[in-house]
């Protein structure tokens, strides 16, 4: 548990049970584990929004897919594909195939690794990790909970990475400073990128794979991301509020398959995160994530991500102003979407002028809920198990 604004680690647990030795193995700082879908946000969608000109409304087709080098990602339900999918939906429901597509076709694994290292992840190996499985958390050396939590804290802190520290200073008996542990800080992403990722990860908690992590005080905003590896060897939830960031890892040192230990309780790590945050935030004032001035809200076509025309199925989405669409969708109609007050002056273009799409937000979002999400990336990463139904394998 850390304060994202200062880098101070406020609480840390290195394991369960009685501590019997000094300087014993600390799983929070020393154990490197496969991160699963927790990597999707920071290895794929962070660089996609920050450097590749994409937006939360950018789309790809969720369909059977093979990368040029022969890698085949699958969603948790290998026979379930959702068709046209936005980046927001891919994050919310932890969708593997389209995430891999965005990494391979737009971001590139090399750029993903650069962003990870800029977020304080020290275990990356470019020669071994710069491949398609990176987007689903398939890496050679794993990652520590401390570093992963620190990476997400940068998103919570408006894009500014602050090195996690366990002490602030050391004084001698007279109060003189012997060691002043000032954390290293730098900008890791644009503030607009951080806010857009936060907005998408709020959906993870409100209706996606992270719903069991919803805290009791709904007046305090909350965002986060789930992660699961093959056969439930590792279960992750890393999330944050405007006050604090926390990361939870569940697993065994010997990678025992928790599929057979947890029964159907695949959400225990999310519930633990919620319980901890409920206690930590007791008595805190309601607070939301503050939207920066370089973000705007637009109504766009749910298929193309362009400004909506009358024939489009539409969604309302947030954009960084420098990547917001400026062209109108011409795929569905030539009649541009306008406010009702201006409708009478619109150019008719297509005489059939289907206007049924202009009056409501009829998006192409995944209505199947958590069943569309999850990880099943092959040898290194597994699936997200989501939602309030603890028996759901998604």
Show which residues each predicted segment covers.
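Mid-domain, small-residue-enriched loop/turn segments at the edges of structured enzyme/sensor domains
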Residues: 73-75, 106-149
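Conserved catalytic neighborhood of penicillin-recognizing serine enzymes
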Residues: 53-112, 161, 173-203
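Short, structural beta-strand-to-alpha-helix junction motif
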Residues: 38, 84-88, 144
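Short, solvent-exposed beta-strand edge segments and adjacent coil->beta transition regions
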Residues: 30, 97-99, 131-133
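A penicillin-recognizing enzyme superfamily signal
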Residues: 1-3, 9-34, 141-332, 336
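Ser/Thr/Gly/Pro-rich low-complexity, disordered linker/stalk segments of secreted
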Residues: 331-394
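Active-site SXXK
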Residues: 7, 34-60, 90, 151-155, ...
